[in-house]
Swiss-Prot record:
Cell wall biogenesis/degradation listed as a keyword: no
Keywords of this entry: ATP-binding, Ligase, Magnesium, Manganese, Metal-binding, Nucleotide-binding, Protein biosynthesis
Ranges for domain ATP-grasp: 104-287
Cofactor(s) essential for the protein: Mg(2+); Mn(2+)
Family: Belongs to the RimK family.
Gene (UniProt): rimK
Enzyme Commission number: 6.3.2.-
Protein name: Probable alpha-L-glutamate ligase
Record GO terms (molecular function): ATP binding; metal ion binding; ribosomal S6-glutamic acid ligase activity
Length: 301
């Protein structure tokens, strides 16, 4: 097969591993920077151009789209879908998962365990907002944050008020969530491929930190998850419509709660912690499922 990888950096671990795995299995691979693509929006012959040439003949495309380029990256991916190229994850599913509020609303509607969450822009009554999530301590997040950036733990009511007021000055949308103290600064990353959890790891925040993201200095280790945690991760992936994703869970006193569903999960941490060949499993999934126009939305977005 001829496989495209939408990635801005061919040297990143995840991109390199996907290239290696695909080539080892006899496929032709090309890395494409989504921001350098330009498109011909045509009803009878949609095209993607790149560095002066028309990109065609691809059987599948693997989107590795960073959060900062979600809008343009998904537009490029959607164009490939319209051309009949099989996407590992569909553009509409990526857009859905990148919208933190929409994700939480969809998951809550289907009864998936979540932390108690408030959503606000410029709340008139901060006290009432804090009371709706059970009061301090709370975690306050910028809606557009990623990799633990724009996430603050407010231990007291006054600290929470100060953080919310500061975020108000940014004219930003915020999420205010209950702090799951019993998680002790750890979360679970469940790596889902094709409706199955193929690997899982525990991420532990460094001392004095509550964010367990590896980008924030957290450490990763192998973990055995419970059947309930496994089922929760699979359901979350299905609700988001993602074939491949990382589902982040916290162990709370009332069962597993979903913190995030990541449509472009890093491979390095999970492969290192579990010693599993995740990249090859992703390529194997593509081999099994890649057919022209094989998307739920039929490339309609």
């Amino acid at each position: 097969m001829k496989i495209a990888i939408l990635s801005r950096n061919a040297k990143l671990y995840s991109t390199r591993r996907l290239i290696e795995a695909a080539e080892e299995r006899g496929h032709e691979v090309r890395v494409i920077d989504a921001l350098r693509c330009y498109m011909n929006i045509s009803s009878n012959h949609p095209q993607v151009h790149y560095k002066g040439e028309v990109l065609d003949g691809f059987d599948a495309i693997i989107p590795r789209i960073g959060a900062s380029i979600t809008f343009y990256g998904t537009a490029v991916l959607r164009q490939f879908e319209m051309m009949g190229v099989y996407p590992l994850n569909e553009s509409v599913a990526i857009s859905r998962s990148r919208d933190k509020l929409r994700s939480l609303q969809l998951l809550s509607r289907r009864g998936v365990g979540l932390p108690v969450t408030g959503f606000a822009h410029s709340p008139d009554d901060v006290n009432d907002l804090l009371e709706t999530v059970g009061g301090a301590p709370v975690v306050i997040k910028l809606l557009e944050g990623t990799q633990g950036v724009g996430v603050v733990l407010a231990d007291t009511h006054s600290a929470a008020e100060s953080v919310i007021q500061a975020f108000n000055g940014l004219k930003a949308n915020i999420l205010v969530q209950e702090f799951i103290k019993e998680a002790r600064g750890a979360d679970l990353r469940c790596f889902v491929i094709g409706g199955k959890v193929v690997a899982s790891m525990k991420r532990q925040a460094k001392d004095g930190e509550f964010r367990s993201n590896l980008h924030q200095g957290g450490s990763a280790s192998l973990v055995r998850i419970t059947p309930e945690e496994r089922a929760t991760a699979v359901r979350a992936a299905k609700i988001m419509g993602l074939n491949v994703c990382g589902v982040d869970l916290l162990r709370s006193n009332h069962g597993p709660v979903v913190m995030e569903v990541n449509s472009s999960p890093g491979i390095e941490g999970i492969e290192t912690a579990t010693q599993k060949d995740i990249a090859s499993q992703i390529i194997a999934f593509i081999e099994k499922n890649a057919k022209p126009h094989n998307t739920k939305t039929r490339g309609k977005g």
